[in-house]
Every structure is written in structure tokens, then in C-alpha cells.
């Protein structure tokens, strides 16, 4: 049985090369596979391995005070969903190319999965404002599933979002906008950019879709959540669409 993890942390990294080398060495020592991106703005990890080895790796990582508060999302599969281990140094841990959307300067307000579920049941937020759920993922991901009634955009990559959102600005003005993505990392930047661009009614879904599945299940969500590995997508119980032995 494999333990699959997704985690990220926006934090100033003054030594990305040193951190990347240490992460690679530790991940190899624990026989983990997956992908890790390191940048001056933080770290983004998708790793899988035996439960004991995953636990040892994250115990090591979170002993570093920069990552002590990192939230890790877990799921299981029978087989390893990654072919290899890759650790790369990038300009951003999620590319958006907007200087006014740096989570290092602070976070946009967020909403927990439990509160969002309540709002979905009521059809409005606690102030009686209508809800708009904004899917910040690309069109390929959306095809596997999204929240019921969500605003989805015809984009191929995250950097396309600002232009694609422009025609919808007027419709969003009187609503509470909840931005969401797979695990929360894109929402962090999207919500900040929207605020900087004059939209002060924007929240981000804490933990993204996977956090919502983990905490409250699939209420209000249609389909699965696409993931960037050989499992392809996860259902609201975090079961993989594909769980094949790639060595067979």
C-alpha cells in the first residue's frame, strides 16, 4: 500500500539550491517517488511511498521551522503512482507571473470546508450574499469534476486566468467569490491577485478540493478531482480512478 501526499508552503527560501539538494537526498533515502518544486517563494511537494518512510521524511522536513506549519494531505493507493523522483528549482512553485500575487506578503481570507458546505446548503453566505465558486484550474482538470454551478474558465494554464476572468467581473461584483483548486496553492495566488485588482469580496477554499473531500466529503461536488500523477483523478472518498501496477 502506498501513502500519497500533497503539500506546499509559501515561505522565503534564501537557499533554494541547498534545500533542493537536502530534499532530494532525504527522499531518495526513504525510497520516495514524485515531484518537488523549490523556489525562493517556497516549496511544493507531491510524494508517495511506504507510510513509515513518508512519515519519516515529513518529520525531517517539518523539523525545519520554515515548514513546521505545513499542512499535508494524505490518500492511499495500492500501487506507486509516480514513475520517478524529480526535485527541481523554479522561479515560482506555481507559475502565475504576477508580482501583485505573492503569498509571502500575506494571505487572502479563507473559508473552511465545513463553512463552505453550510453556505452551499443555504445557497448564500452568512451575510445573505449569493455565492460564486470560481474554479481556477484548467479545462482538462475541470472535465473530471467540479463544484455544482461553479464558474469555470476555458484556460489551458493558470497564467491565462486573469484574461479569462475579465468578462465576468461585473457578474462577480455583488457576490461572495470562493476561489478553489486542487489543493489550495493556486487559490492562494488567484485570491491575492483578485484583491489587488480591486475585488474585495474574494475568499479561498482552505485546502482546496482535496481538503474539502478529506474533511466533509463530496457534498455539492460533481465527479472527481483530477490529480497530476498516474491515478488520474480521485473521488470524494479519495479513491483513485486508476490504481495499476506499473511494473506488471
UniProtKB/Swiss-Prot annotation:
Domain of life according to the entry: Bacteria
PROSITE patterns: RHODANESE_3 (PS50206)
Documented EC number(s): 1.14.-.-
InterPro entries, per the entry: Rhodanese-like_dom, Rhodanese-like_dom_sf, TrhO, TRHO_N
Family: Belongs to the TrhO family.
Catalyzed reactions per annotation: uridine(34) in tRNA + AH2 + O2 = 5-hydroxyuridine(34) in tRNA + A + H2O
Domain Rhodanese, residue spans: 127-221
Organism listed in the record: Xanthomonas axonopodis pv. citri (strain 306)
HAMAP family, per the entry: TrhO
Full protein name: tRNA uridine(34) hydroxylase
Biological-process GO terms, alphabetical: tRNA modification
Enzyme class, UniProt record, top EC level: oxidoreductase
Active site: 181
One function term, GO molecular function aspect: oxidoreductase activity, acting on paired donors, with incorporation or reduction of molecular oxygen
TM ranges: none
Record's function text: Catalyzes oxygen-dependent 5-hydroxyuridine (ho5U) modification at position 34 in tRNAs.
Keywords for this protein: Oxidoreductase, tRNA processing
Pfam families: Rhodanese, UPF0176_N
